[in-house]
Amino acid sequence: MAVISMKQLLEAGVHFGHQTRRWNPKMAKYIFTERNGIHVIDLQQTVKLADQAYEFVRDAAANDAVILFVGTKKQAAEAVADEATRAGQYFINHRWLGGTLTNWGTIQKRIARLKEIKRMEEEGTFDVLPKKEVALLNKQRARLEKFLGGIEDMPRIPDVMYVVDPHKEQIAVKEAKKLGIPVVAMVDTNADPDDIDIIIPANDDAIRAVKLITAKLADAIIEGRQGEDADVAFEADIQADSIEEIVEVVEGDNA
């Protein structure tokens, strides 16, 4: 059975693509139809490809892979942080700093500085420093935590990267490809899928859609690490004519 059901995808709005004028023709094979100026994603393919992504991530986790979640848009930031943390992995949910992967040595120095400031506070150094200096240190720590807090304890460059919206995260994807890191991504109808190793055709602008897919990949990691079977999605009342039902839903929602 599928790890995510058609019903779950519909309820989360995963089928809504972008306006047709904003599409990337390379996504044509993942589009079922167009309604009212909006592309409708073929959820039968999403179900199948989500299964492939789940298996890939689960197997990677079973081999102790380091997995980095990336999603810096506001719709993704919370889910990326929450689900990566739940799975015991790492995340970047604010601006991607150029060179995060390709210049890992420099990033490690910034992380070391973050840890140093934290240690200074824990050891009571802040108590003997001038208030102005403490304020500057706190400001520096806040900035470092914002951009690097999610990878503070990442032991090495990741083995796998999961991305929400590779169109927005082009720099991150390019760095991963340069280093040979496989990329799993939620890919909307406006994105270029060429640099993505495992594509999940999906609406990457809806919070519920991002949460659904991201949580399922976190489940895959947990299953891979712990050997626990994740919940399997049952199709309930959406079966063979599901694509036609998708069109009806889209027409209803855009009427």
UniProtKB/Swiss-Prot annotation:
UniProt KW keywords: Ribonucleoprotein, Ribosomal protein
GO cellular component, one term: cytosolic small ribosomal subunit
GO biological process: translation
Molecular function terms, GO-annotated: structural constituent of ribosome
Gene3D superfamilies named among the record's database cross-references: Glucose-6-phosphate isomerase like protein, domain 1, Helix hairpin bin
Similarity comment: Belongs to the universal ribosomal protein uS2 family.
Record-linked HAMAP family: Ribosomal_uS2_B
Name of protein: Small ribosomal subunit protein uS2
